[in-house]
Amino acid sequence: MSCVGKLPIIIPEGVKVGLNDLEVKISGPKGELSKSFKGSIGISLAENKLLVKPLSSSKSARAMWGTARSIISNMVTGVKEGFKLKLEINGVGYRAMMKGKYLNLMLAKSHNTKIEIPSHIKVEVPKQNIIILEGTDKEKLGQFASIIIKQRPPEPYKGKGIKFEDQFIPCKEGKKN
C-alpha cells in the first residue's frame, strides 16, 4: 500500500478537473495543465476529491501509484497558487539581466550566455545576482532552473556559481603547503 498514493487529492474552489481515459486536465485561475498517464493507473473523481488507484498489483503499477498522485497534486497546486523558485548568483562580475524574451548571463566566460525563456515561465531579475522564476508546471520550472544552473554550477572551493537560494554548498579546504 502506497503511503502517498492512497491519500485523496482535495480539489479547491476555482479549480476544474476533466478526466478523459488516461488524460487529466486541470484548469484554474493561473492556467491550465494536462498530463497523460499509462494504463496501469486509474483516476476517479468523487465530489471534490481525486482518487488514484493502481489497476493491477504489478510492481510497475504500484511504483507509479504514488508518483501519479504527486504529479496530479502538483498540477492542482500549480493552477491554483503557482510555483516560485529563487536562484542566487555568487561570484565577482557574475550578473544576470533580462533582454526581451532572453535571460542574459555574464558568468566570467569569453561571451555572455543568452537563454530563451519558455512562454509558460515568468522570469524576474530584481537584482543583478537574484533570478526569480514563476510558473504553473513544477516539473518544467525545475528543468528550466537546472538549465540556468548548468551554465555555471557552484564550485566547492569558493562557492562561486549559480545555486538555489536555500541550497547549502559545503566548501572544501584549499591546498596546504
From Swiss-Prot:
GO molecular function annotation: rRNA binding; structural constituent of ribosome
Keyword rRNA-binding: yes
Highest rank taxon of the organism: Bacteria
UniProt cross-references to Pfam families, sorted A to Z: Ribosomal_L6
SUPFAM superfamilies: Ribosomal protein L6
InterPro entries membership: Ribosomal_uL6-like, Ribosomal_uL6-like_a/b-dom_sf, Ribosomal_uL6_a/b-dom, Ribosomal_uL6_bac-type, Ribosomal_uL6_CS
Gene3D superfamilies linked to this entry: Ribosomal protein L6, alpha-beta domain
One annotated GO biological process: cytoplasmic translation
UniProt keyword list: Ribonucleoprotein, Ribosomal protein, RNA-binding, rRNA-binding
PROSITE patterns reported for this sequence: RIBOSOMAL_L6_1
GO (cellular component) term, any one: ribosome
Family the UniProt entry places it in: Belongs to the universal ribosomal protein uL6 family.
Subunit structure: Part of the 50S ribosomal subunit.
Cited function: This protein binds to the 23S rRNA, and is important in its secondary structure. It is located near the subunit interface in the base of the L7/L12 stalk, and near the tRNA binding site of the peptidyltransferase center.
Protein name per the record: Large ribosomal subunit protein uL6
Organism this protein belongs to: Rickettsia bellii (strain OSU 85-389)
